[in-house]
Each structure stands twice: as C-alpha cells, then as structure tokens.
C-alpha cells in the first residue's frame, strides 16, 4: 500500500531466486486501498511517499511501479463495485475478527489487480499471514492462473517486524513495542521444550508493559481455526496497539522439522525430481526405493529365493544399510559395507524388487529404519508407501505419476545412460504395467495414493517444471519462516 521499506525491497529481490522460471519483468503495485480501512482507521493519514517508493523499487530491481488512483482501479468509485466475500471461517479469528470487512476489501482489490495485470507470479509477505492464506484460497478456488510466492517476515535490527506504520512510533514507544516479538519468540522456544503456550500470560505481560492487546491466539496455520501447539503447524499471532499505532506479529510452533512424502509408481521420475527438490530446499533426501533395491541385491548375492519370506528374513539379521548424501549424482547406498549405488539399478534387481518388497518382514524392518531417520524431520522421502505407512503425518504428500507409455520412454533412456541393454518400448511398458499391478495388489503396504496427497501427473512436464510445482506445493504447507530456502 505504499510507504515502501526494506521488507518490500526484499519481496522484489526474491524474484531473482526463481531460476529459469524468473518472470521477464517485475511490476510493483502501490495502491492505498480504501476498502481495507474501517470508518475509524487511518486511511487519510496512512503514509504516502511516491517518490521514495519509486526510488526503493528501482533500487531493488523492479521493472516498473504502478500507482493508480482509486478511480482507475474502481471506475465510478469503490462503493459502486462488486465485492468478493471471504468465507467466514477464514476471517473468524485474528485480524478478521477485529477488522470486519477488511479481508473482503483485500481480496476484492487483489482480484481486480490480477485481472488488470495478469501476472505469472504474485509475491506476498508472510508477515500478513492471514492475508496470505486467504489470497492463496482465492487463487486456488477461482482457478486463477498465477503462482503465489511468500517471502519470510523481514525484521529491523532490533527485532521489530518491518511495517509502514512503524514510522508512527516515537523512540520510547518503539522500545515498548519490542516486547511484541520478544515475548512471541520466547513462547516459541518454550513450546519447543514441551511447555504449553500461556495466552493469558502473554496478554498480561504485554498489558503490564503498556501495550493494548487486541488479540493473542493460536490457530491452525492453514485453516486459521483454533489449535493448540502439537504435531500440526500452529500459528501464534498477536495484534497490539502501542499508543495509536497498531502492530501485528506472529511465530510458528512445531514439534519437529517438516517432512515431505513423495509416492508413486515405478518410472515416474521420483528419484530424479526428489533429489533435486531436496537439494533446492536443503532437505535430507531419503531414497527408500534404493533401500528395497539394496535388500533385493543382497538376496541375489546370497542366492536366496526372493519369493520365500522365511529365507529373506534370515538376511535381514544384523543388516547394515547406509544412505550417504552425495554432492553430485545419486545418493550413495551401502549394504553390509558394499557400495551398491549402481548395482541396485540393474534390470536383474528391478525385476525382483517388487517381490522382495512385498514381504512383511522386509517392510517392517525398513519402515522402522526410515522412521528413525525421520524422527527429527527436515527430510523428503520417496517410495511407494511413504505417505500412507512411513510418514502418515508428513506436512506435504504428493503422488507423482505418469502414463505407462511415458514411464517406459524414461526407463529406456535411463537404461541406455547406464549402459544396460534397452528392450523394446512395448516390452518395457508391459513390464511397468505388471510392476504397477504387483505393487498395488500386494497385501502389505500396497501402492496407493494417500487421501490427503496431491496427485501430480508429469506427462509433458520438464524436470524443472515438476520441481517448481513441488516447491510451490511445499510452500503452501511450509512457510519460509519455518524452513528457509538456502541462500534466500
């Protein structure tokens, strides 16, 4: 809304990290929206400095700045326009409860902006978290052709979240206001240690320091309904007044780092994109398929009948299986001291892995090991039953798939690149369909899409497009403030 500061500059600069999907131009829109202000709020006195805004936008890398008048955005006046109404459950708490009609005004003007500009990407700050959640719902439910990109809250050196309204604060008031982020941060640390958030205690502490508390609440970070801290990502948010200045801030509460589960059939490209996705976001990559392949390789080395669960179980005793991150190429896989990184990709292993993986003793042993690896989170795992059996509480679940014909084509390329003989495409497609049948009909942990997973069909998509889609899905569930993108 203008009065740009360095947090707005960070929004503009963030576009430079979009890689090959970076938009050709970056437009900054400056518009003090009358629909967002209540009758007694500061619309008339809201800070405006267009010359300074233009300078900051240019310095930060903007291609242009658009500062329309009210008549340009709302021909005939704001009161004569249709308005979009935000679903009541999304604004029943936090700022929505305190400022009735505010978010209706936000979505109405943003929808108007998107219709006029038709951007590829909409960049928003995570500081106004409720606004970001509501606008993501708007884009998703209306099917608008735009990606929503969130940027972590930017803070001044003293810890106060950047805001255009901070300039209202006198020196002494700013010192008072610092209690807002400081006590939120302390509550987050205590929550990590297993202590419950004391909302009444926070309110009392702020009031004793001279701040007027409008609200302090814990809500689900995505449906914005009341929630106590636990496994799910929880938002602890507050709004206070310091003198005449209204300030909002928040922190996220979570018992562990995020987990991503990517399931799908053989040949869907899971390993390739998951490895790149993990590297892009700084997550540990857990290739569970490689673990099953390694056990299959071991059965072949010991001449064990892969169909005999009793015989297979004997080689699981004292099993030493290691996955070692690699700076380049596939993840290193070692079993009982043997480096089997390449060997487990052979056609011989591929033809038997479904049989071995179907045994309950194998899945029990490897699932337990995978869950131990993921106890602290901070990882992405790919396989067949990650979202349904291994990490059913993962923050993001994706079912990555492609048509059998497309998967056969990819398998042929992979075999050729590895120096293995390449069967006819029709034969490969038949093998893949049979593998799908075996994986989806086995009694133990069959291949199936988790109820809360997002299906991603990758036919016709480049590897980079699949990775960017996964990142977008991740950021809907995991804010930058919870898991920052490396180098951001």
Swiss-Prot record:
It catalyses: (R)-pantoate + beta-alanine + ATP = (R)-pantothenate + AMP + diphosphate + H(+); CMP + ATP = CDP + ADP; dCMP + ATP = dCDP + ADP. The gene is panC/cmk. ATP binds at residues 1-8, 125-128, 154, 162-165. Residues 1-251 are annotated as: Pantoate--beta-alanine ligase. It comes from Prochlorococcus marinus (strain MIT 9303). GO terms for molecular function: ATP binding; CMP kinase activity; dCMP kinase activity; pantoate-beta-alanine ligase activity. Keywords: ATP-binding, Cytoplasm, Kinase, Ligase, Multifunctional enzyme, Nucleotide-binding, Pantothenate biosynthesis, Transferase. One of its GO terms (biological process) is pyrimidine nucleotide metabolic process. NCBIfam families: cmk, panC, PRK13477.1. In the N-terminal section; belongs to the pantothenate synthetase family. In the C-terminal section; belongs to the cytidylate kinase family. Type 1 subfamily. Catalyzes the condensation of pantoate with beta-alanine in an ATP-dependent reaction via a pantoyl-adenylate intermediate. Catalyzes the transfer of a phosphate group from ATP to either CMP or dCMP to form CDP or dCDP and ADP, respectively. It is found in: Cytoplasm. This is Bifunctional pantoate ligase/cytidylate kinase. One of its GO terms (cellular component) is cytosol. Its main location: cytoplasm. Residues 252-488 are annotated as: Cytidylate kinase. (R)-pantoate binds at residues 36, 131. Signal peptide: none annotated. Pathway: Cofactor biosynthesis; (R)-pantothenate biosynthesis; (R)-pantothenate from (R)-pantoate and beta-alanine: step 1/1. Pfam families: Cytidylate_kin, Pantoate_ligase. Beta-alanine binds at residue 36. Its EC number is 6.3.2.1, 2.7.4.25. The active site is at residue 8.
């Amino acid at each position: 809304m203008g009065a740009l500061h360095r947090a707005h500059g960070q929004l503009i600069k963030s576009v430079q990290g979009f890689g090959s999907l970076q938009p050709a131009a970056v437009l900054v829109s400056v518009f003090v929206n009358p629909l967002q202000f209540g009758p007694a709020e500061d619309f008339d006195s809201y800070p405006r400095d267009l010359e300074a805004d233009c300078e900051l936008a240019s310095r930060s890398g903007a291609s242009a700045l658009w500062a329309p008048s009210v008549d340009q955005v709302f021909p005939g006046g704001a009161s004569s326009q249709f308005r979009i109404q935000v679903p009541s459950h999304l604004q029943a708490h936090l700022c929505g409860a305190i400022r009735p009609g505010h978010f209706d005004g936000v979505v109405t003007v943003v929808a108007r902006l998107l219709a006029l500009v038709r951007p590829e990407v909409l960049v928003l700050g995570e500081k106004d978290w409720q606004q970001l959640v509501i606008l993501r719902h708007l884009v998703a439910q209306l099917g608008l052709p735009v990606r929503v990109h969130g940027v972590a809250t930017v803070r001044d050196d003293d810890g106060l979240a950047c805001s255009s309204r901070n300039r209202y604060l006198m020196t002494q008031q700013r010192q008072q206001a610092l209690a807002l982020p400081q006590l939120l941060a302390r509550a987050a640390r205590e929550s990590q240690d297993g202590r419950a958030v004391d909302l009444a205690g926070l309110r009392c502490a702020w009031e004793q320091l001279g701040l007027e508390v409008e609200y302090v609440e814990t809500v689900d970070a995505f449906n914005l309904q009341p929630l106590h801290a636990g496994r799910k990502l929880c938002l602890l948010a507050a709004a206070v007044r310091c003198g005449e200045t209204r300030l909002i801030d928040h922190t996220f509460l979570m018992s562990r780092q995020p987990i991503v589960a990517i399931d799908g059939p053989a040949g869907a490209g899971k390993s390739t994109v998951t490895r790149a996705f993990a590297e892009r976001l700084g997550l540990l990559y857990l290739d569970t398929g490689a673990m099953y392949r390694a056990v299959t390789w071991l059965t072949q080395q010991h001449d064990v009948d892969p169909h005999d669960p009793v015989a297979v179980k004997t080689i699981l005793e004292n099993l030493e299986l290691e996955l070692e991150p690699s700076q380049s190429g596939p993840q290193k896989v070692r079993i009982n001291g043997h480096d089997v990184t390449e060997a487990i990709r052979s056609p011989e292993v591929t033809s038997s892995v479904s049989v071995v993986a179907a045994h309950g003793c194998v899945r029990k042993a490897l699932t337990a090991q995978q869950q131990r690896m993921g106890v602290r989170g901070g990882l992405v795992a790919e396989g067949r039953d990650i979202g349904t059996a291994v990490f059913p509480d993962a923050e993001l679940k994706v079912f990555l798939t492609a048509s059998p014909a497309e998967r056969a084509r990819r398998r042929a390329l992979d075999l050729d690149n590895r120096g293995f003989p390449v069967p006819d495409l029709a034969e490969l497609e038949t093998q893949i369909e049979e593998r799908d049948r075996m994986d989806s009909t086995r009694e133990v942990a069959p291949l199936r899409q988790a109820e809360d997973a997002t299906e991603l069909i990758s036919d016709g998509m480049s590897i980079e497009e699949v990775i960017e889609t996964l990142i977008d899905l991740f950021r809907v569930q995991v804010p930058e403030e919870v898991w920052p993108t490396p180098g951001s």
